[in-house]
């Protein structure tokens, strides 16, 4: 019965190769061991210097933030490029809001707060398709429906103004708005019949 070795392994396999002196616990020959330790020391000095540089700028960081050594480097270029466009959009939106009349501003606020109930949208989609609908799909469909209703209402308001009438909108305004939006491809043609021959 053999102990400490695998079957078929000879003592020669465990013997030290010729021409090499003893080795340390990592299996690195002693004559080469000194050369490998110097770069490790330099590397650890560089790492500690990088950590010090990171912590100097983070004196205001909260106590719940992870240590500087565990933080990952973030891409600041993308954020710098993205931020000015957001600021430009905010400035443009602010300008538009100041230019709106009181009626337009109240309509904008109502439109912004309105939403289709996602559970009902999901139930409607499920009844049409016969399959279960994910929450993300219902959210997307509710958003699309909100945009569609917004476009129909805007077109209906244009129709109402063009006809010389004043709001509130009436069904005839909505019908005319839908009729005008159909050629633009916003609504599918429900009277389409496939011609076989």
Curated annotation (Swiss-Prot):
Residues 1-88 are annotated as: Disordered. Residues 37-50, 72-86 have a biased composition (Basic and acidic residues). One of its GO terms (molecular function) is protein heterodimerization activity. Expressed in fetal brain and testis. One of its GO terms (cellular component) is transcription factor TFIID complex. SUPFAM superfamilies: Histone-fold (SSF47113). GO terms for biological process: RNA polymerase II preinitiation complex assembly. PANTHER family: TATA-BOX BINDING PROTEIN ASSOCIATED FACTOR 11 LIKE PROTEIN 2-RELATED, TRANSCRIPTION INITIATION FACTOR TFIID SUBUNIT 11-RELATED. Belongs to the TAF11 family. This is TATA-box-binding protein-associated factor 11-like protein 12. It comes from Homo sapiens (Human). The lineage of its organism: Eukaryota, Metazoa, Chordata, Craniata, Vertebrata.
């Amino acid at each position: 019965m053999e102990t400490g070795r695998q079957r078929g392994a000879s003592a020669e396999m465990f013997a030290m190769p010729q021409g090499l002196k003893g080795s340390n616990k990592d299996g690195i020959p002693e004559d080469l061991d000194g050369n490998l330790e110097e770069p490790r020391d330099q590397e650890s000095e560089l790492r500690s210097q990088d950590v010090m540089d990171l912590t100097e700028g983070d004196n205001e960081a909260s106590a719940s933030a992870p240590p500087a050594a565990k933080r990952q480097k973030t891409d600041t270029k993308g954020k710098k490029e993205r931020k000015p466009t957001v600021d430009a959009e905010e400035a443009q939106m602010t300008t538009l809001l100041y230019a709106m009349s009181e009626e337009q501003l109240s309509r904008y606020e109502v439109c912004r707060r309105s939403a289709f109930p996602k559970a009902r949208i999901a139930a409607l989609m499920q009844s049409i398709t016969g399959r279960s609908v994910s929450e993300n799909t219902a959210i997307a469909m509710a958003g699309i429906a909100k945009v569609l209703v917004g476009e129909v209402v805007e077109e209906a308001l244009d129709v109402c103004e063009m006809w010389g009438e004043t709001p509130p909108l009436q069904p005839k305004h909505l019908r005319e708005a839908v009729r005008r939006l159909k050629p633009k491809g916003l609504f599918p043609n429900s009277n389409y019949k496939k011609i076989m021959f």
